[in-house]
Amino acid sequence: MMCKALLLLLAATLCGSLPAQDTEETARLLALFNSHPKADIAVELVKKYEGLHDRSDYPYYGYGHRRLPNEKLSYGMTEAEAEALLRKDLAVRYRLFRKYGKDALLLTVLSYNVGQGVLLGHGGHPKSGLVRKLEARNRDIYREYTAYCRYKGKTVRSIERRRKMEFLLLYEP
């Protein structure tokens, strides 16, 4: 009985420290993302093209955040709260693409719209040609980047304009 009580106490102690570690990690990720010189441009681009979502956009909240199973979100969030949520999402994605150097922010913004699994290969998707090209140290990626503008096989002009604007403002030669 004493052993169970000690295990329970240990588990409670560990669980109690998780949120602090999580917020510490989130703060570190946000600082890393926000230190990028073009982070604010990336945030403004996503805000412009995503727009603030409402109830008709369920399960998307804020500026395109997809609600996770244990999250409690409201459509009544302020623009500042929605932007903070967007920055947190972009920071988490930025961590995944950091190894791509100058192209990390560009891949971060693209993955926010198309999904990181499509780019990095996950769930039946092979690794994208864009990422394979970058891994081969070939940075001539304009065509591959702007190719992510199709829906059901057809080019969508508004998405094409978005990709061109993202590339123009975020690509670092």
Regions found by a protein language model. Name each.
Residues 1-3, 17:
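Universal eukaryotic N-terminal targeting presequences
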Residues 5-14:
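Sec-dependent N-terminal signal peptides
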Residues 12, 22-25, 107:
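Intrinsically disordered/low-complexity terminal segments and short unstructured peptides
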Residues 18-53, 65-72, 76-94, 118-173:
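Long, amphipathic alpha-helical surface segments
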Residues 54-58, 96-106, 144:
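Surface-exposed patches in mature extracellular/periplasmic domains of secreted proteins
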Residues 58-61, 65:
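Early exported N-terminus immediately downstream of N-terminal targeting peptides
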Residues 91-94, 98, 112:
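Generic short alpha-helical segment signal, independent of protein family or function
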Residues 104-118:
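Short N-proximal segments of mature Sec-exported proteins
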